[in-house]
């Protein structure tokens, strides 16, 4: 899903179903490393909820606070991800994927989903997934 470097740690996020070694309701697993050789698994970052399973996405450190989520001195880590509504998919809906946002204010140790998810509704596309976010310095925008 994504890798980001923040305050001396590499953060790796990955799709994960913690209950079995088969496909199921996806979560975002989370691991950190200081050297990219030795990894520590942290608690699951993102869990499925009423909007759906947690599919692919990306994460950034919002140094410029473009999200407006900063509190105190720590830049927020912000993740954008695909919600996959399996019940809607099973019913034949073409708009079963939307985009959600989550953030961490404690170096990725805990995550809060944005209160107004989904942040991007499906515009009528069958495959509306895998959002990527990056900072464009020339225009000072995401």
What positions do the PLM features span?
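Beta-rich carbohydrate-recognition and catalytic domains
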Residues: 1-131, 135-142
């Amino acid at each position: 899903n994504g890798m980001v470097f923040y305050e001396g740690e590499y953060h790796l996020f990955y799709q994960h179903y913690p209950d079995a070694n088969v496909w199921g309701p996806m979560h975002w697993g989370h691991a950190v490393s200081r050297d990219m050789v030795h990894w520590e698994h942290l608690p699951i970052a993102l869990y499925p909820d009423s909007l759906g399973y947690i599919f692919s996405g990306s994460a950034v450190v919002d140094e410029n606070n473009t999200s407006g989520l900063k509190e105190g001195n720590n830049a927020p880590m912000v993740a954008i991800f695909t919600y996959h509504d399996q019940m809607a998919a099973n019913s034949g809906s073409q708009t079963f994927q939307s985009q959600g946002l989550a953030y961490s204010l404690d170096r990725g140790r805990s995550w809060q989903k944005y209160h107004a998810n989904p942040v991007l509704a499906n515009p009528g596309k069958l495959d509306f997934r895998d959002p990527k976010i990056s900072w464009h310095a020339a225009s000072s925008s995401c």
